[in-house]
Curated annotation (Swiss-Prot):
The keyword Nucleotidyltransferase does not apply. PROSITE patterns: ABC_TM1. Part of the binding-protein-dependent transport system for oligopeptides; probably responsible for the translocation of the substrate across the membrane. It is found in: Cell membrane. GO terms for cellular component: plasma membrane. This is Oligopeptide transport system permease protein AmiD. Keywords: Cell membrane, Membrane, Peptide transport, Protein transport, Transmembrane, Transmembrane helix, Transport. It comes from Streptococcus pneumoniae serotype 4 (strain ATCC BAA-334 / TIGR4). It is a multi-pass membrane protein. CDD domains: TM_PBP2. Residues 107-295 form the ABC transmembrane type-1 domain. Coiled coil: none annotated. The keyword Chloroplast does not apply. The chain crosses the membrane at residues 43-63, 111-131, 145-167, 171-193, 234-254, 274-294.
């Protein structure tokens, strides 16, 4: 039979206060989100690309004297169709205009349209969805509206509206925002129905807590990851909408640069002077891809179930 070596043990006094001490670090939701978000290498790479594109798109045009409609050099053959070099990084087109300037002016407009349309749709969708989820009378009406609108392809609605009201910056944003928000509202409504009747919400309602306060304090914080996921899907989608519509002459006016407009204008250069077509297209792909990857990683990180 083995014996216990008493020298390996030490008697200590009982300390009730020490036994109640919590040694685990305090949990911070947003710190955990940031930690999970930056853990992935794809986040760092794509976030770097996205930040660089956004900074150049919004800062460079402030100091450039670029005029998208300038054709004064059309007869100066010495500045036409210059391939990318140290002086003209992206080359020049048939009018002698710098493609570098055109790409960043166009990227700024495309990103602005996407961000503004996304914010408008999210604000309306979350607000209406919150009311939709807690009001049975509103639910009956909105379900009928949703059933009608959801059967029409969103892109078709945008095309019809832009064709009807004409090309323009705010016209395009209006067309993107007329009905798109209803899909977000329906998703918020479904999520609220999941959480509305949980025990702690029933207890709050029994104690007399106002319904709107329950939604704002108890339910909406649970939907952060869902809202972020929706936002990440909308941003690249609206950029693609703008590019598609501008390519067919339905988006921005021909006098306003955008990535879609540049791709449309230089589509005949796919085989000759191909850089005019591929550089704007590559920029569009980089913007959309970086937005999607960064957004998806942020949505995953905002889900508390992924936190450790």
């Amino acid at each position: 039979m083995s014996t216990i070596d008493k020298e390996k043990f030490q008697f200590v006094k009982r300390d009730d206060f020490a036994s109640e001490t919590i040694d685990a670090p305090a949990y911070s939701y947003w710190k955990s989100v940031f930690k999970q978000f930056m853990k992935k290498k794809s986040t760092v790479v794509m976030l770097g690309i996205l930040v660089a594109i956004i900074l150049i798109s919004f800062i460079y045009p402030m100091f450039s004297k670029f005029d998208f409609n300038d054709v004064s050099k059309v007869n100066d053959f010495s500045v036409r169709y210059i391939k990318p070099n140290a002086e003209h990084w992206f080359g020049t087109d048939s009018n002698g205009k710098s493609l570098f300037d055109g790409v960043w002016f166009g990227a700024r407009n495309s990103i602005l349209i996407s961000v503004i349309a996304t914010v408008i749709n999210l604000v309306i969708g979350v607000f209406v969805g919150g009311i939709w989820g807690i009001s049975k009378s509103v639910d009956r009406v909105m379900m009928e509206v949703y059933n009608v609108i959801s059967n029409i392809p969103p892109l078709l609605i945008v095309i019809v509206l832009t064709y009807s009201i004409g090309a323009g910056f705010w016209n395009l944003i209006f067309a993107m925002s007329v009905t798109t928000w209803i899909g977000i509202a329906f998703m918020i409504r479904v999520q609220i129905l999941r959480y509305r009747d949980l025990e702690y919400n029933l207890a709050s309602r029994t104690l007399g807590t106002p319904t709107l306060k329950i939604v704002a304090k108890n339910i909406m914080p649970q939907l952060v990851s869902v809202i972020v996921t929706t936002m990440t899907q909308m941003l690249p989608s609206f950029i693609s909408y703008e590019a598609f519509l501008s390519f067919f002459g339905l988006g921005l006016p021909i006098t306003v640069p955008s990535l879609g407009r540049l791709i449309s204008d230089y589509s005949q250069n796919v085989t000759t002077n191909a850089y005019l077509f591929w550089i704007p297209l590559t920029t569009l792909v980089l913007v959309s891809l970086s937005l999607f990857v960064v957004g998806q990683n942020l949505a995953d990180a905002s889900d508390p179930r992924t936190h450790r």
